[in-house]
Amino acid sequence: DIAIRGDRIVGIGTNLGTADRTIDATGLAVSPGFVNMLSWATDSLIADGRSQSDIRQGVTLEVMGEGWSMGPLSDEMKAEAPGQQGDIKYDVTWTTLGEYLQFLEDKGISTNVASFIGATTVRIHELGYADRAPSTEELERMQELVRAAMEEGALGVGSSLIYAPAFYADTNELIALSRVAAEYGGRYISHIRSEGGQFVEAVDELITIAREAGIGAEIYHLKAAGADNFDKLE
């Protein structure tokens, strides 16, 4: 038997006493809610906060921010937003990542939500889609965007280095952003730069970022693509 008070498990075992409500789970499995570590429910939760496709599979936490996050947004990014939307259309009424998360909470959603700040989002905010390194001043502004997001509750910095314009960022840029997240106990999480011929080098880059920034790091969907690269996972 499992005893629950409010939103906490307070007892597991037999003879736990009586309760105001009893659920007969005979023949069923009882587990904590599942975490969707790479969620793209950013738009669908706006359309339908019930999150039926995930909540009915036991998902209770949507973690967003694989390289791209719903904030911070510049005026130019807001202007581009309608043309980048798919079947789900909506007005962008927020600017920062924290404001987006608050928007979802105020709207009402079934799942819990959390987000990394996207390294791509920060880069576009300051550099647009330019294939170049940021200037000292631009990098400082990018770091301040990360700082603001961390203070709003971001989990850390997320990157997706296999896509443009994300792969325009070099290792030093990612270290600089991650150092700010590290100050708040955040993490660096990445869709690494290569899952094929440069797989080992891509993993080495993530380790370098973690060491230089003093931050914990994780890899999204760790895999090696192509039979010639399978042994690299060893």
Spans of features found by a protein language model:
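Histidine-rich, glycine-flanked metal-binding segment
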Residues: 1-33, 48
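Generic beta-strand/beta-sheet core signal
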Residues: 5, 12, 64-65, 116, ...
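Residue-level detector of flexible, active-site-proximal loop/helix-junction positions
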Residues: 16, 29, 120, 224-226
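A structural micro-motif
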Residues: 20, 28, 111, 186, ...
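Divalent-metal coordination cores built from histidine and acidic residues
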Residues: 28, 47-155
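Metallo-beta-lactamase
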Residues: 33-42
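Histidine/acidic residue-rich metal-binding segments in metalloenzymes
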Residues: 133-159, 165-234
